[in-house]
Amino acid sequence: MKALVLTLAVLFFTGSQAQHFWQQDDPQSSWDRVKDFATVYVDAIKDSGRDYVAQFEASALGKQLNLKLLDNWDSLTSTFAKVREQLGPVTQEFWDNLEKETESLRQEMNKDLEEVKQKVQPYLDEFKRKWQEELQIYRQKVAPLGEELREGARQKVQELQDKLTPLAEEMRDRARAHVETLRQQLAPYSDDLRQRMATRFEVLKEGGGSLAEYHAKASEQLKALGEKAKPALEDLRQGLLPVLESLKVSILAAIDEASKKLNAQ
C-alpha cells in the first residue's frame, strides 16, 4: 500500500523531482547512484554479450567457422577491465569536483523540496487512509461471493463474474475520485515547487557570473578528464589491435576454407 501511495504521488506531483521526497535515510549520493547504475549497466551488457557469443560458437555454424570468438571476447573483456581500472581514479576525481562545485545549489534545492514535502505529507496520509478503507469495503463485499464459488458448481462462475463486475467498476470509480482529489490538492504545491526551481535558475542566469562560473568549471573539469583519460584510451587501442587482427585472420581462414569446399564440389 505504501508503494502504491508513493507511486501515485510521483505521477501526480512533480515527476522525477518528487522522488527526492521519500529518499530518506539513504547515505548514497546522487552521483554514487549514477556511477553504480553505469557500472551495473556495463556489466550486464558484458555478461549478456558473452552468453550470445558462447551460444553462437556452440551452434553448427559457429563450429564450422571456428572463429574463436569466445577467446577474443574474453580478451576484450580483460582489456576493458584494465582500462576501467585505470580510469577509475580519474572519473572519481571528476565526480568529486562536480559535486563540490554544485553543493550550494543542491542544498538550496533540497531545502525547497523538504519544505514542500512537509506541506503535502498530510494529503498523502489522508489518501492512504481512504484507499485502505476502500479496499476493506471491497474485501467485505467480495468475501461472500468467494464463499459461493467454493460451495457452488462451475455454472456459477458466470454468475459470480456478473456479480463481481459492478463491484469492480464501483471500486475503480471510487479510486479515480480519490486520485483526482489528491491531484487537485497537490496541484498548488506542484506549481509552487516549479516556481521555486525556476527562481533558483533565474537567479543564476541573471547573476551571469555564477552561471558562467559553473559552465567554466564544468568545461575545465571535462577537459582535464579527457587529458587524463588519453593514456588509458591509448592502452585500450593497443590492446584491441591484436584481438581485431586475430579475428580478421580467423574470418579470412573461414572464408578460404568455405571457398575450397565449394570448389571441390
Curated annotation (Swiss-Prot):
Its main subcellular localisation, reduced to a broad class, is secreted
Question: According to its UniProt record, in which tissues is this protein expressed?
Answer: Major protein of plasma HDL, also found in chylomicrons.
GO BP, one example?
A: positive regulation of cholesterol efflux
Q: Which GO terms describe its molecular function?
A: amyloid-beta binding; apolipoprotein A-I receptor binding; chemorepellent activity; cholesterol binding; cholesterol transfer activity; enzyme binding; heat shock protein binding; high-density lipoprotein particle binding
What does the entry's PTM section describe? Glycosylated.
Q: Where are the residues of the annotated region 10 X approximate tandem repeats?
A: 67-265
Q: Name one GO cellular component term.
A: very-low-density lipoprotein particle
Q: Which domain of life is it from?
A: Eukaryota
> What residue range is the signal peptide?
1-18
Keywords (alphabetical) are: Cholesterol metabolism, Glycoprotein, HDL, Lipid metabolism, Lipid transport, Lipoprotein, Oxidation, Palmitate, Phosphoprotein, Repeat, Secreted, Signal, Steroid metabolism, Sterol metabolism, Transport
Which of the residues bear the PTM Methionine sulfoxide? M109
What are the sequence repeat spans here? 67-88, 89-110, 111-121, 122-142, 144-165, 166-187, 188-209, 210-230, 231-241, 242-265
Its annotated compartments are: Secreted
> What is the protein's known function?
Participates in the reverse transport of cholesterol from tissues to the liver for excretion by promoting cholesterol efflux from tissues and by acting as a cofactor for the lecithin cholesterol acyltransferase (LCAT). As part of the SPAP complex, activates spermatozoa motility.
Q: How does it assemble?
A: Homodimer. Interacts with APOA1BP and CLU. Component of a sperm activating protein complex (SPAP), consisting of APOA1, an immunoglobulin heavy chain, an immunoglobulin light chain and albumin. Interacts with NDRG1. Interacts with SCGB3A2. Interacts with NAXE and YJEFN3.
This protein is called: Apolipoprotein A-I
What is the native source organism of this protein?
Physeter macrocephalus
